[in-house]
Amino acid sequence: MDRFLEDGRIEIEGISATSAGTLNAIAYGWGAMRGGPEGAREALESLWREVSRAGALYSPVRQWSLDRSWPGAAALSGLTFGLFSAWTRVLSPYQFNPLDFNPLREMLRNCIDFEELVRCDCVDLFVSATNVRTGQVRVFRNEEITPEVVLASACLPDLFQAVEIDGEHYWDGGYMGNPSLFPLFYYTRSRDIVIVHINPIERDEIPRTAMDIENRLNEITFNASLLKELRAIAFVVKLLEEKWIRDEYREKLKHVLIHSVRADEALKDLGVATKFVSNWEFLTDLRDRGRETAGRWLAENFDCLGERSSIDVRTAYLQRGDDRPLTRTT
């Protein structure tokens, strides 16, 4: 996002986000309403600096692997996470954190004026959280966003108690919408949807260690809801292209243009343990990887915006054979 804002050629009409992406979304909205793109960039950096400060005190995992001078650093980081992960399988957050302490709660109140944010009219925000009782996704819009909504969107159930909002309890939105794409179809005018991936879609190697298996399972789980929505998009596009829909209904369907900023190569060396790391050196490394990836995407695909999809959803995400022509049955 920082690279897109620096570029200045892209106007962001809506952001659908979940989990850590929700922090980016609210920081963007808060900063943009006060100072435009540069204000948004400043707000993003300020918020993540506060996340880093909070993590220095409370993060269960340290990024030892950044110390390249010690060969065993990565192994120690994995061991630390493994011990912590085992702990969460024995005790729930209702047991080891009965007071429901979350360092993000106070940090959010210090960084963002939510009474002002709910009046943001420079971007449509869509924040996803998973309803624990129903298993359905709930999407919160600008006027509904509070610190509790942000905490719900990023609530990993192994770490934190479910967040109660309006009598319902919520976990991380990534389980059912990572992110949710449908609000962008229904509530925005733009045909272009740019998906920014933080989990690799594909990995060439078969995981064989316990840590690698857990890492890949985490990636597959959090990519599943997105892939289902992309399958639905591909189906509608196929119906439009093969003229299975009557002319009087075709105009009612938005022929969306899909773009994808994928960082499979840039992030392939980062496992699930790094999702709990928040020191500033590591966060700026992530930012720089993202900026480099976004810069390449802009150079290669900017001219596609407003004209055509820069990827073929069927070949980029779906299994081979899913793009076979539809056949009528009688």
Regions found by a protein language model. Name each.
Residues 103, 108, 237-330:
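C-terminal helical/tail subdomains of lipid-metabolizing enzymes
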Residues 85-191, 195-196, 202-215:
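Active-site gating loop/helix substructures
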Residues 20, 155-156, 199-201, 264-268:
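Short connector loops/turns at beta-strand edges and beta->alpha or beta->beta junctions
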Residues 11-14, 168, 256:
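Short active-site oxyanion
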Residues 1-102, 108, 142-152, 208, ...:
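Patatin-like phospholipase
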Residues 207-238:
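Acidic, Ser/Thr-rich peripheral helices and adjacent loops at domain boundaries
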Residues 16, 128, 194-196, 257-261:
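Hydrophobic/aromatic beta-strand patches that form the interior of the parallel beta-sheet core
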Residues 30, 210, 275-279:
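Short glycine-enriched, charge-decorated loop/helix-capping segments at active-site entrances
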